């Protein structure tokens, strides 16, 4: 039992969520609320990052489950939180040092079906990215018109000294307001008309995304050097993250495919043949021969009918089938046929009744029955401590 569920609620998962479920939840939410896509959702993005930072760490998660957010803030497992952007970069690839040398990576989520991952597919993805302005060649203005900002001397930062007491000063660093942190200044009349002095422009890019057989939900496809461009930096990457939709029949478990199959009692006892449509539009027939009893909950498999193995597409996992046996309704047989059926089935064990035994009857289980009894019991106890007046009839 966890003390509080706030972090789990932020990610939209249950307290018993696996690491894979946590990763999938973070991936979807982080891409949705990233400041580049939702500039007004900075606080939400921060909450998502903090929740994932704690729950993805086994020690921090254990501490949180026992003591809640207060236990984390008190520093029992390292204390404090990392930068939301650092967590995002570590998850999707990249990092601070990389960002200093290269332009920003662009991350896009691509929705795919289980059929796409089974058969392979090609998708065209249209997106917007920053490219260096070709009109001014990334200068922001005419040749010779760009000058070093005299206010910050080209650093893009201002340092102010603030005296906070006798003999005590505080050094405060802030973005230079004169050049907006660029370290350069361009006269408005000399600014490039195409990019308005920003050195970059937005451009539409069409990417052809090849989804190989056997790729997995959450797998990344990286287009190196196709990300945002910035003057003086190497272009970043475009990272495509595959997001698999749920399938109506099959569930993927690693290289295996899992499904449930309903069969009737006669099929469970006497054998059956069941067709299954595969993800590559073939039909395979599952056969159980007479005399091979299939019990409710039995799990069997078909070799080499699961998912193709990534980069080894001619090898496949297993198709795993869990059987659900449907029993007939009450009274489906007349008494004489029921006697005949009993003779055909294995003999049942008779119970020798004694005087010490009590006869009881089976009834259908009602999960709400105990709840109602508990509620009524509390009501009776309440009446004992707080007697209520009887209902009076109105008299004329």
Curated annotation (Swiss-Prot):
One of its GO terms (cellular component) is nucleus. Residues 351-396 are annotated as: Disordered. The modification Phosphotyrosine is found at residue 380. The keyword Chloroplast does not apply. The modification Phosphoserine is found at residues 83, 334. Residues 352-364 have a biased composition (Acidic residues). CXXCXGXG motif repeats lie at residues 133-140, 149-156, 176-183, 192-199. SMART domains: DnaJ. Residues 394-396 form a propeptide. The modification Cysteine methyl ester is found at residue 393. Co-chaperone for HSPA8/Hsc70. Plays a role in protein transport into mitochondria via its role as co-chaperone. Functions as co-chaperone for HSPA1B and negatively regulates the translocation of BAX from the cytosol to mitochondria in response to cellular stress, thereby protecting cells against apoptosis. Stimulates ATP hydrolysis, but not the folding of unfolded proteins mediated by HSPA1A (in vitro). Promotes apoptosis in response to cellular stress mediated by exposure to anisomycin or UV. This is DnaJ homolog subfamily A member 1. It comes from Pongo abelii (Sumatran orangutan). The gene is DNAJA1.
């Amino acid at each position: 039992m966890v003390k509080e569920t706030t972090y789990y609620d932020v990610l939209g998962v249950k307290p018993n969520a696996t690491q894979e479920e946590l990763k999938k939840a973070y991936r979807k939410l982080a891409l949705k609320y990233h400041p580049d896509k939702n500039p007004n959702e900075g606080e939400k993005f921060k909450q998502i990052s903090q929740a994932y930072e704690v729950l993805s760490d086994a020690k921090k998660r254990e501490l949180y489950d026992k003591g809640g957010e207060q236990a984390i803030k008190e520093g029992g497992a390292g204390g404090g939180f990392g930068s939301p952007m650092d967590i995002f970069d570590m998850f999707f690839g990249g990092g601070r040092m990389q960002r200093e040398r290269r332009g920003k990576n662009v991350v896009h989520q691509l929705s795919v079906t289980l059929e796409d991952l089974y058969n392979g597919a090609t998708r065209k993805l249209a997106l917007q990215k920053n490219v260096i302005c070709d009109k001014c060649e990334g200068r922001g203005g005419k040749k010779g018109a760009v000058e070093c900002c005299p206010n910050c001397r080209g650093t893009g930062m201002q340092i102010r000294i603030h005296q906070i007491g006798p003999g005590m000063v505080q050094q405060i660093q802030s973005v230079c307001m004169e050049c907006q942190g660029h370290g350069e200044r361009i006269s408005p009349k000399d600014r490039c008309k195409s990019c308005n002095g920003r050195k970059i422009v937005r451009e539409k890019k069409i990417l052809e995304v090849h989804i190989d057989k056997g790729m997995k939900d959450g797998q990344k496809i990286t287009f190196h050097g196709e990300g945002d461009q910035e003057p003086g930096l190497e272009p970043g990457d475009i990272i495509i993250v595959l997001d698999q939709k749920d399938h109506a029949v099959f569930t993927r478990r690693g290289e295996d495919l899992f499904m449930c199959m309903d069969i009737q009692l006669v099929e469970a006892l006497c054998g059956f043949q069941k067709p299954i449509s595969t993800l590559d539009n073939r039909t395979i027939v599952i056969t159980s021969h007479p005399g091979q009893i299939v019990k409710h909950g039995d799990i069997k498999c078909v070799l080499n009918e699961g998912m193709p193995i990534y980069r080894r597409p001619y090898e496949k996992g297993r198709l795993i089938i869990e059987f659900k046996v449907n029993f007939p309704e009450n009274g489906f047989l007349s008494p004489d046929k029921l006697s005949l059926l009993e003779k055909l089935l294995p003999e049942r064990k008779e119970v020798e009744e004694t005087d010490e035994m009590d006869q009881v009857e089976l009834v259908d289980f009602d999960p709400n029955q105990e709840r109602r009894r508990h509620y009524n019991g509390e009501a009776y106890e309440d009446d004992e401590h707080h007697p209520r007046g009887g209902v009076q009839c109105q008299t004329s």
